[in-house]
Regions:
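Conserved phosphate-donor/acceptor-positioning beta-strand/loop module used by diverse small-molecule
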Residues: 151-152, 169-185
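Hydrophobic anchor at the beta1->P-loop junction of P-loop NTPases
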Residues: 19
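Short beta-strand-centered segment that lines the nucleotide-binding/catalytic pocket of NTP-utilizing
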Residues: 38-53
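ATP-dependent small-molecule kinase phosphotransfer cores
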Residues: 58-162
Length: 185
């Protein structure tokens, strides 16, 4: 544990916190509130979609566009440019890429493809979480933020082993941030 008490944490001149909890519990709402009061907000989901999954997402858009002859011709001649427009508030390109297993004729993807994409997401999530210490430094050095909030996303529990004291993700986060778990009732 990085701090022995809440008082010790509050006395620090700069704060770095990672919010954990299941999807929908309010992590992003809290992170946005803190951002509005002067904290640097790091969204793991945003980082996943813009840094580590962007190429997969855009390639999927292009695969779909290639099914339409009009768009296929424009893509092949470099006449159009297709990009994802992921924002903190709109992660739809990421969730759409991850897809839903089911009949491809009805908009689903095969279970094998679904598992492949879930593994890509898992790897991207781990890498995004391991980026946190570097972003704390960047938030301070580049932007002048003293306080840092990491919105970890709802699937943190799927990429860490809390029983392993040497889990690389938990070790990195606990050495650089205060871990705050939010629970719903």
């Amino acid at each position: 544990m990085r701090f022995k008490s809440a008082q010790e944490f509050r006395k620090q001149p700069a704060h770095a916190v990672t919010i954990m909890g299941m999807s929908g519990v309010g992590k992003t709402t809290l992170a946005v509130m803190l951002q509005k009061s002067g904290w640097f907000q790091y969204s793991v989901d945003y980082r996943i979609g813009t840094r580590y999954m962007d190429e997969h997402i855009v390639d999927n858009f292009k695969r779909e566009a290639m099914k339409v002859p009009f768009l296929a011709g424009l893509l092949k001649s470099d006449s159009i440019y297709i990009r994802s427009n992921i924002t903190f508030d709109n992660l739809s390109p990421l969730s759409t890429y991850l897809g839903k297993p089911g009949n491809p004729a009805l908009g689903g993807i095969t279970f094998a493809e679904y598992k492949r994409r879930q593994n890509q997401h898992r790897d991207a999530e781990i890498r995004s979480l391991l980026d946190v210490p570097g972003f704390i430094e960047r938030a301070h050095e580049i932007y002048g933020y003293r306080h840092f909030i990491c919105d970890s996303g709802g699937s943190l529990c799927e990429v860490v082993n809390p029983d392993d004291p040497n889990d690389p993700v938990l070790k990195s986060l606990s050495e650089s941030t205060l871990l705050l778990n939010i629970e719903g009732n």
